[in-house]
Amino acid sequence: MADVVLVEGLAVETVIGVYDWEREITQRLLVDLEMAWDNRVPAASDDVADALDYAAVSERVSQCLQALQPQLIETAAEAVATMLQQDFGVSWLRLTINKPGAVPAATSVGVRIERGQR
């Protein structure tokens, strides 16, 4: 399947980081998602019930990251990927989480993972 549903630039404010001062503040994460989804059914039915609800996906990603409050971006990525596959039945995904400002000389740092089969 070559169909992909996108969520790009999802901003999530959460506690994340390994330093004591980071545990006392929220920081912005930027999340990009590519999720395999057969779009032929919703295209034919024109019914949102047949589609991957990207608003619900976005809300759950935000909730997951805000509840988790991880130290590492890697931990955050694995938790989000697992949740999306379990809760939404996404067979394959590519997930990027960026933490802008984490390294002063860089625009952003982050991780990108792929899970599942296309």
Stretches with model-predicted labels:
Residues 1-118:
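N-terminal, polar/charged subdomain of small-to-medium soluble alpha/beta proteins
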